[in-house]
Swiss-Prot record:
Organism: Bacillus cereus (strain ATCC 10987 / NRS 248)
Family annotation (Gene3D superfamilies): YjbJ
Protein name: UPF0337 protein BCE_3655
A Pfam family that the UniProt record links to this protein: CsbD
Source taxonomy: Bacteria, Bacillati, Bacillota, Bacilli, Bacillales
Classification via InterPro entries: CsbD, UPF0337_stress_rsp, YjbJ_sf
């Protein structure tokens, strides 16, 4: 991704982290692995945070363009 991706990089990374977290959490539940479940929940939180950062960057860029 380029320097001027306007939050796209964070959005993609966030989506990947959320999917990865969901998989870990489900596998952790099926295998009764509490550590894996916790890692999955943490990955989903990280993904949501990255997605939020991406959205903010996008909005800032839009604001600057229409200023």
């Amino acid at each position: 991704m380029t320097k001027h991706d306007h939050g796209l990089k964070e959005k993609v990374e966030g989506a990947i982290d959320k999917v990865k977290g969901e998989v870990k959490e489900v596998v952790g539940k099926v295998t009764d692995n509490k550590k894996l479940q916790a890692e999955g929940k943490w990955d989903k939180v990280k993904g949501t945070a990255k997605d939020t950062v991406g959205n903010v960057k996008e909005k800032v860029h839009e604001y600057k363009e229409h200023k």
